[in-house]
Amino acid sequence: MPKIFLIKNRLHQQQQRLLESQNLLQHKNQDDERLVPPLSPSGSGSGPSPTPTSQPPPEPQGQGQQVLGQVPDSDQQPLSLTRKRFHHRRHYFGQSRHSLDHLNQNQSPNPNANANPNQIQNPAELEVECATGQVQNENFAAELLQRLTPNTATTAQNNIVNNLVNNSRAATSVLATKDCTIENSPISIPKNQRAEDEEEQEDQEKEKPAEREREKSDERTEQVEKEERVEREEEEDDEVDVGVEAPRPRFYNTGVVLTQAQRKEYPQEPKDLSLTIAKSSPASPHIHSDSESDSDSDGGCKLIVDEKPPLPVIKPLSLRLRSTPPPADQRPSPPPPRDPAPAVRCSVIQRAPQSQLPTSRAGFLLPPLDQLGPEQQEPIDYHVPKRRSPSYDSDEELNARRLERARQVREARRRSTILAARVLLAQSQRLNPRLVRSLPGILAAAAGHGRNSSSSSGAAGQGFQSSGFGSQNSGSGSSSGNQNAGSGAGSPGSGAGGGGGMGGGRDGRGNYGPNSPPTGALPPFYESLKSGQQSTASNNTGQSPGANHSHFNANPANFLQNAAAAAYIMSAGSGGGGCTGNGGGGASGPGGGPSANSGGGGGGGGGNGYINCGGVGGPNNSLDGNNLLNFASVSNYNESNSKFHNHHHHHQHNNNNNNNGGQTSMMGHPFYGGNPSAYGIILKDEPDIEYDEAKIDIGTFAQNIIQATMGSSGQFNASAYEDAIMSDLASSGQCPNGAVDPLQFTATLMLSSQTDHLLEQLSDAVDLSSFLQRSCVDDEESTSPRQDFELVSTPSLTPDSVTPVEQHNTNTTQLDVLHENLLTQLTHNIVRGGSNQQQQHHQQHGVQQQQQQQHSVQQQQQHNVQQQHGVQQQHVQQQPPPSYQHATRGLMMQQQPQHGGYQQQAAIMSQQQQQLLSQQQQQSHHQQQQQQQHAAAYQQHNIYAQQQQQQQQQHHQQQQQQQHHHFHHQQQQQPQPQSHHSHHHGHGHDNSNMSLPSPTAAAAAAAAAAAAAAAAAAHLQRPMSSSSSSGGTNSSNSSGGSSNSPLLDANAAAAAAAALLDTKPLIQSLGLPPDLQLEFVNGGHGIKNPLAVENAHGGHHRIRNIDCIDDLSKHGHHSQHQQQQGSPQQQNMQQSVQQQSVQQQQSLQQQQQQQHHQHHSNSSASSNASSHGSAEALCMGSSGGANEDSSSGNNKFVCRVCMKTFSLQRLLNRHMKCHSDIKRYLCTFCGKGFNDTFDLKRHTRTHTGVRPYKCNLCEKSFTQRCSLESHCQKVHSVQHQYAYKERRAKMYVCEECGHTTCEPEVHYLHLKNNHPFSPALLKFYDKRHFKFTNSQFANNLLGQLPMPVHN
């Protein structure tokens, strides 16, 4: 094969070089052949074809003609290529070789390749020779003619085939072809020979001059016989051409190739074909050669051969196999206009050769002809090349693998969603692949694509595989899962010899990334979300055979992703598994693709290891000088920092990480110092970062957790991988008091993700969830500001962007508390995989080492609770397996990175965790707050120094509270609502967050439930926490002492109790994480996508202006909105802070909101600033000015994706849904996603059979009023009474039974009496659902009970 490819390349070059000479020769040949009058059909066919033959043979000589074996010269050149084709072709032609000499010629050029065909053909050829020496001569002559013309070549083979089949026909056809060519131009033969000689000279690689001479001499000797049989041959030449003209397609002179391919189907009529092919011989030969030989190499005239050269080797094989032209007799020949003279000649020719050749070759060729018999397969051949064209390198196999992967991924996702809870419970010491599976499944669910949890975990407990990527996870080593994301879902195959495989998407995103979509597991929104970087992320070359090699698809766009992946891989490696991440391309910084070389047990300095992650066992893990990412590889430095690529944490970081179980002194980024994040130097892959975070989040964070848990519990590389954001924040505050200012971090987060990709990425709920999951990892060390920031910042600040420096927070006591809390947590976390993930993310985001230590401690205790300390981080990772929770949590929290709504939701969800971690979190939270303030301040200060200064100075505390709160909440809630919420609650901004849901007690309850439902991901988690761990809320209260936390407790508990009861089966069926709180729509037949949660609209709501934010707060967002608004301090602080850094920070928030679908968070004070930012970021495309314009209500609202303009923000918001692949609403029956309740209702009625609109004139009923009106107008000519665009009368339809009424009171009473558990009843206070005309009735309803918390 390689030789063939080389030959193809040579042939390409030679053919191109020969094109000019061949063109001249062909023109001459064409002229000469045209001059030959007797064989007008053959002449016309051969005339043009000889020129193509001259050209095409050089081009396809190795390919097409060698395949044909017709022209020795052509055979000589690309023999190797054509050999395979020819083998197939011959096997299909079944010994349909022209003559032994011709075969020998073919053999000499392709002795090996043609050996089999020749051997197969030898008996037939011997018989042919015995039967008639003329046949051999004719074969030689045919070969010469074939050299001269594709028709002759094809006819020669066809003649052989025909001779085998029918001696008379075959002989006549061969002779006819030769005779026709000779008669047409005996001179042309020499010219053709000359042309061939020239071609041979040019193509000296092919040593057939001697054979040509032989053929020439033989052909000349045979010319007399050919001339005698020219007339016979003419008819059968056409026939033969049709039957054997597969080589001709090579000649695209006539451009009839396709039609000829079609004719291939017909050629069974030999005589008709002979005439038709003679006339359209160039075309028909082109057809066959197209499918067989010329499909790869076009006719000499065209350079298509050059286009197809790589394919021909693979293609021709299958083409010939499938489309071996049946004998001319068997082929149905398209009846082209026959030349009467050629027909007569054909009849003459037929007489002599038919009698001679039929017996000898009929036996041999008939079976091959039978095989070729279904000539209708040739159209299949025509398509087969296309199939094969993708399979240059066994692409067919790859495609099959991809399909299989996609199928497996879907199944895995399905299973993973179901197994999400189990995974938490059954956390193995290895990263829980189920987490990865469930996350993609959740993400897929968020996309509304149904629960295809497609994560195949090569190493079930160990390989961390995000099903979303449809990646094949082949466990390499006990814990390593090498993941090749099918179709370029980045496959950071996680090879963790000792540390457990990191799974993965490129950037360790858990194989659920923008790259993943090709696998079919990912929802399409991923691709739309990815800023074009992820599809290429799959560029990542195959995984290294070594089980420890983790390949990340590294694209320049994937810097952060790859860096994050490398970082998490490195962290995984230091965690105890050698993980070698090979980032393809220069994705990761200086080294090209981030290659994470993590030696298991400390072995494994990266040869390529841009990131060298020493196994935990080997504290002295040498990082290559190139291992700029190594800093990330060390647990100290977030691999996301590898986005900086130059963070030297690699050397010291790795060594420190490995050496220092928990406290690795963090090396500053070579350029940005210890805390690049402090400078706002967040390597922002902006969209990539987020995708990377999503991918990294799952796979990386999980693997880091695993390795941290497995190898070095103290050195938790997950934090390094976890967030470059936290790393940056933490690194700026390397000290336990991370210098990162949470507010600044928020701004940084926002700013880093200012790009338009934010919306795309935000719509990528999975990324958010991964992001959140990743932040969740920091829960353990929520003291580190980057932990808290992680969630908020993850979208914009990828783990790469933020450099989580291992902050040596004084968390030992906290760790003890954490251990105790973890024991409690684990019971709940097992149920909600998110809490552990949050802890993991806290570890990652928090002071990396201390966070790692704490995290390891937490995980240890978690494992003690669930398994053992050895499983600590893995356990945490395995708890993340319900990554959907983290995805939703991360989405919700990221959506509200700056808003307490999600944070509270996550907090509620992680309240138990918060209880467990509350003391530690409180202790570390202040440290983190300081660190985050410093780090975030530094980051934003660097990125937006003035903004940061203003923010820091004016609202430094407020900002800390607000952003830190938001970040902490987001990260806490996302990473581990427990620790983050505890910390946040401990913080003043936590109080703000906690107060967010307390606009009103009832509203807070409703908001808590609504936020839980609206932010199904975060909220579902929160209600889970509230219900299963109401103490978590209490801990949040105790730690945060925030007013909201009690509200969250009561409300979330009530909402969770109410909603979770019904939603658990649904969540399971939809493959959502068990902790999710679902918000029902459409009478309970649809749910708000927990991952999209109002944030998944391509950012419409999260992008909403402040004006729109009010609407959002009114809507399902209102709960989160209220929560955020419930903390006016936060709003004021954020507003003031963001006003100070309005444009930039708003742009950050815009991006975050867009990315995180922060309409929930945007609905709060931050939504005032950031909502403007996000809305305008999307609308105006300019962060600051657009924000002002959008907020000012400019008439120009521009869609950043398609540049459409809208006069109203709501119109833009509605339009943005079109660009979001994460659907806002999911069908509870099938999980299909929709962005509009109108479409959801129309769809769900197909499940329920509700057809409320009945035609009074006939029996028909319809699901939509418009359908009924259209029906009445068209069928019954009944015109409706509504004017154009006039709003119809409100119709209340019971989605359960189809009961319809125009009275809201009747509808409500119907629901209450007949469907008392219908979620629609919970909307009675919503004027959109119940426009009560009777105010007294409405007041009575509202006065009966507190506002329903459900939605």
Swiss-Prot record:
Residues 61-72, 104-119, 447-486, 835-878, 916-962, 970-979, 1025-1044, 1121-1175 have a biased composition (Low complexity). Keywords: Activator, Cytoplasm, Developmental protein, Differentiation, DNA-binding, Metal-binding, Nucleus, Oogenesis, Repeat, Repressor, Transcription, Transcription regulation, Ubl conjugation, Zinc, Zinc-finger. This is Transcriptional regulator ovo. The record marks A445, A446 as: Cleavage. One of its GO terms (molecular function) is sequence-specific double-stranded DNA binding. Residues 233-242 have a biased composition (Acidic residues). Only 3 of the 4 C2H2-type zinc-fingers are required for DNA-binding. Based on its marked lack of evolutionary conservation, the fourth zinc-finger is unlikely to be required. Residues 487-505 have a biased composition (Gly residues). InterPro entries: Ovo-like, Znf_C2H2_sf, Znf_C2H2_type. Residues 644-653 have a biased composition (Basic residues). It holds the Pfam family zf-C2H2. It comes from Drosophila melanogaster (Fruit fly). SUPFAM superfamilies: beta-beta-alpha zinc fingers (SSF57667), beta-sandwich domain of Sec23/24 (SSF81995). One of its GO terms (cellular component) is nucleoplasm. Transcriptional regulator with essential functions in the germline and soma. Plays an essential role in regulating the formation of apical cell extensions such as denticles and aristae, and initiating cytoskeletal remodeling during epidermal differentiation. Disruption phenotype: Adult lethal. In the rare adult escapers, trichomes are often absent from large areas of the thorax and wing, or they are sparse and atrophied. In the aristae, the central core is shorter and lateral cells either fail to develop or are strongly reduced in size. Embryos display a smooth cuticle with sparse atrophied denticles. Isoform D: No visible phenotype. Isoform D: Males are viable whereas females are sterile and do not lay eggs. Isoform D: Ovaries are atrophic and slightly larger than the oviducts at the posterior end of the ovaries, and egg chambers and germline cells are not visible. The keyword Transcription regulation applies. Residues 22-77, 100-119, 184-397, 447-554, 640-665, 778-807, 834-887, 916-1000, 1023-1044, 1113-1192 are annotated as: Disordered. Residues 205-232, 262-272 have a biased composition (Basic and acidic residues). Residues 49-60, 324-340 have a biased composition (Pro residues). A zinc finger (C2H2-type) spans 1197-1219, 1225-1247, 1253-1276, 1292-1315.
